[in-house]
Amino acid sequence: MAETASTETTPAAPPAEPKQKKKKQQPKKAAGGAKAKKPSGPSASELIVKSVSASKERGGVSLAALKKALAAGGYDVERNNSRLKLALKALVTKGTLTQVKGSGASGSFKLNKKQLETKVKAVAKKKLVAPKAKKPVTAKKKPKSPKKPKKVSAAAAKSPKKAKKPVKAAKSPKKPKAVKSKKVTKSPAKKATKPKAAKAKIAKAKAAKGKKAAAKK
């Protein structure tokens, strides 16, 4: 009989728990709702200044004439009626406009030429002052360049010190001259003594011969 292999039964793994999907937090809506968008284009004060400067009336521009000019340019005068009045009052208080007639927003208005002239002069002065401040910066950089030749002059001043060494060579020839002079003076003296001794010997020999000859006679 064939033996059957015993198969061990392993316990099945527990089923994986499904991952809980994180809920995306929705952005909270602003309590006040969407903010009102600012109107694109030039402001009411800018339009008023342009229309007043464009008019050629000597007595100034009235409020009714301003509204007509702005409406022709595509500006909604009926909706922005309150803004126009506030802008006119603000321009008068700043001094950009002068009120010729009436009071408040009603009346006629002109540009204040004196204030415009002062603004133009102030802008012109700023442009002239700016380049003057830049000139000293370039002037400071120029004197830095001549510093390099100083190193060359210092090196040239140090180099002549090396020429002092040949002085030692001039001292050395003095010793051999003194030695030669002593030898020359001593040698003739010795030679002079030798002939004197020889002459004395010859004289003695002659005298001895003369004595022998006299004795024989």
UniProtKB/Swiss-Prot annotation:
Biased composition (Low complexity): 1-11, 28-45
Domain H15: 40-113
UniProt protein name: Histone H1C
Entry GO CC: nucleosome; nucleus
Compartments (UniProt record): Nucleus; Chromosome
UniProt entry tagged with the keyword Metal-binding: no
Reported function: Histones H1 are necessary for the condensation of nucleosome chains into higher-order structures.
Gene Ontology molecular function: DNA binding; structural constituent of chromatin
Biased composition (Basic residues): 123-151, 159-217
Single biological process term from Gene Ontology: nucleosome assembly
Keywords: Chromosome, DNA-binding, Nucleus
